[in-house]
């Protein structure tokens, strides 16, 4: 099996239930004040950021390990780009923390829940229809997150990426793409969430097992259909033409017994000049996808796009067409060899197993903690204990330190 390496912004159904920030939470009860401090891992601490930034600032010469493969100009461009990205990461992260803190301190979560109840009530759903209210809450919360994150996304795309020559989007294309992503995400997220909440409601004492199995099935289905049905909504995929590169890729795959069936090229150049490669598929039906920006002199997709065959207007077209770009065949094979190495060494299977073990543990602990009314009261829910809010509190806040550490382990494992 192979898990999809890139999801175009679509997250795991459980993880994207709600993202409102991580911060301190305060509550008052019997004249006592309880404080729940969400602990962050060292990876998100200012000390780590300062250490990383110091490396970017002081390493002004090409390290000897890279001297044979990278010139000074390329290294300097990369260093300055990472400096700007580091600064952006700090300020956007700080804003996220402040936003999350204000939401918690001002009672934003119970307020939005009450507003969601009013909206669902006007739609004809009584208070006992908790799932309907939960879906309204989720829609409003993700809309709020998208709107508040928009200025940061715009700055990242049209200031930082533009400054360093990576951005290929127009403003019109950016907004159309963002709206499309939001709609597609809601079409997946809302039905999946409603079914998950229903399973938890009727699952009895062993609901955590059924919920875990459900999310496992959903994850596998999304991995299966993403590249064939979801990704084409955003990007154009065409088979890699016959030639030396395709033959070399097929030979590489054969040499490690990789069951390759097709090789595609995706039009990544309409968004960015960054390049990438990944593979997907289950069992004996695996496919490789190369970004067109990875391939030297490859411009078939850009040419078709400029001729208007995809029906998009001028505002949505990328700004640079038929530009010489990418890597030589040997370099493409090196990039692809890294990805195939994950498969050959069993990283994909190991990652899936570890991920599902982690998911099961989280649902089990959720089953243990969901009955604690004090958790709900700490977030302003004194009379009701909605299942969606419980999922958000436990997965987003209580498990925050655990999630940070396991994410770090996953990254280290894949590297």
Regions found by a protein language model. Name each.
Residues 2-18, 31-387, 397, 401-415:
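Polar-ligand-bearing catalytic/cofactor-coordination segments
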């Amino acid at each position: 099996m192979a898990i999809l390496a890139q999801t175009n912004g679509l997250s795991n159904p459980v993880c994207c239930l709600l993202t409102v920030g991580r911060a301190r939470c305060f509550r008052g009860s019997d004249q006592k004040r309880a404080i729940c401090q969400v602990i962050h891992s060292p990876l998100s601490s200012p000390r780590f950021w300062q250490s990383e930034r110091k490396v970017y600032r002081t390493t002004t010469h090409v390290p000897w390990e890279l001297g044979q493969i990278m010139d000074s100009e390329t290294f300097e461009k990369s260093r300055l780009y990472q400096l700007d990205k580091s600064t952006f990461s700090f300020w956007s992260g700080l804003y996220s923390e402040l936003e999350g803190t204000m939401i918690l301190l001002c009672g934003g979560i119970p307020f939005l829940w009450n507003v969601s109840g009013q909206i669902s009530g006007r739609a004809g759903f009584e208070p006992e229809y908790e799932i309907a209210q939960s879906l309204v809450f989720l829609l409003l919360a993700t809309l709020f997150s998208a709107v508040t994150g928009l200025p940061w996304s715009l700055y990242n795309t049209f200031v930082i990426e533009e400054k360093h020559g990576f951005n290929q989007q127009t403003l019109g294309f950016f907004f159309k793409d963002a709206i499309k992503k939001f709609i597609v995400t809601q079409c997946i997220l809302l039905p999946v969430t409603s079914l998950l909440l229903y399973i938890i409601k009727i699952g009895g004492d062993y609901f955590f097992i059924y919920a875990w199995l459900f999310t496992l099935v959903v994850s596998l289905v999304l991995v299966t259909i993403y590249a064939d049905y979801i990704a084409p909504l955003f990007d154009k995929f065409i088979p890699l033409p016959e030639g030396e590169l395709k033959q070399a890729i097929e030979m590489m795959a054969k040499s490690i017994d990789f069951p390759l069936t097709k090789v595609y090229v995706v039009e990544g150049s309409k968004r960015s000049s960054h390049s990438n490669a990944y593979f997907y598929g289950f069992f004996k039906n695996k496919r490789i996808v190369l970004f067109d920006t990875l391939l030297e002199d490859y411009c078939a997709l850009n040419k078709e796009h400029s001729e208007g065959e995809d029906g998009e207007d001028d505002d949505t077209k990328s700004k640079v067409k038929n530009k010489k770009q990418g890597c030589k065949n040997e370099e493409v094979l090196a990039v692809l060899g890294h990805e195939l190495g994950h498969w050959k060494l069993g990283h994909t299977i190991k990652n899936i197993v570890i991920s599902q073990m982690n998911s099961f543990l989280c649902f089990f602990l959720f089953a243990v903690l969901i009955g604690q009314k004090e958790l709900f009261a700490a977030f302003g829910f004194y009379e009701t204990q909605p299942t969606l809010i419980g999922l958000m509190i436990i997965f987003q806040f209580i498990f925050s330190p655990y999630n940070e550490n396991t994410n770090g382990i996953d990254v280290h494992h894949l590297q």
